[in-house]
Curated annotation (Swiss-Prot):
PANTHER family: LEUCINE ZIPPER CONTAINING TRANSCRIPTION FACTOR LZF1, PROTEIN ROGDI HOMOLOG
Gene Ontology cellular component terms for the protein in this record: nuclear envelope; RAVE complex
Keyword Magnesium among record annotations: no
Region Disordered, residue ranges: 1-25
Protein name in the entry: Protein rogdi homolog
Biased amino acid composition, Polar residues: 1-12
Compartments, as annotated in UniProt: Nucleus envelope
Keywords for this protein: Nucleus
Predominant cellular place of this UniProt entry's protein: nucleus
Originating organism: Caenorhabditis elegans
Keyword Nucleus (UniProt): yes
Family the UniProt entry places it in: Belongs to the rogdi family.
InterPro entries in the cross-refs: RAVE2/Rogdi (IPR028241)
Amino acid sequence: MEVQSLTITTNYPPKPASPNPQDIRDTIRSNKTNENLWIQRKDVDTTLRSALEHLKACCIVLNLSAKCDERLNVAVSHGTTEKYQLMSRTGSSDNLKAAVTLLDDNVIQAEVTVKYPKAGGGYYRAVAQPDVQWKLQQLQDLGNHISRVTITLCDLQHEVNLLKGDGERDAFTLATGARILEELKLTMNEISLARNSIMLPRKRSLLELCYFPPTRKFVPPLPQDQLISFYISCCRLVCASYQMVPKTVHPQGLSVFMAESQLPHLDDVIKHLNTVMAILQKLINYLSATMS
């Protein structure tokens, strides 16, 4: 019996052409550009509106109606005096106690009771009602930074509205996206400075305190070996007493007592600033990721 061979012929489809790397790059670039333009059209204005609402709240709390951008429509207001009792953080030390009355960023009155062995009764007590301007520079810086941010973002919002055109045709390009991104980064830096102004302590040197005019306004006068300082740290008003002592008593020749009080309105400001930074950073990330 004859065996017949069986031949199977298979027609394979032609090998697909390898994708052109340049075509892939062009497609990716085109997709990024479209996404960037979409973000400019849909996200930027919404984000700016939200950020400005939080900044407006800060301006109201800090009475910045005269400093912030008028387009926020912050009602004109006048600050009211607030008196704060400053105590040792441990709550048990009576080395230093103070009462400070603030009007916005100004110290109106300061009362101090500090342990001082050379004084009668072992304590030095004094009141200062300075007839010279006594500003807490950190609070003033906070207001200035926030005010500058409101102006920058209001200007940017106006520019974005102009780019939107009549609604049917807009003028958004990658160049406008780059400019928006640059302004947002500058704004973030300004907000960071605002936060740092009340989170990080900024103390005057002992030499500066010696020549600081309000220091000389205590009645009775401060002893020659005693200095008093007020500053902001972590949203707290801090009073520090510095007394020169023999190095046999303290190696540095300086005895320091501190008392403090939380400033609730600064806690509110920090919360708003943190929110603004979060939403602006999200927009910055989107724009940065879609820049070709």
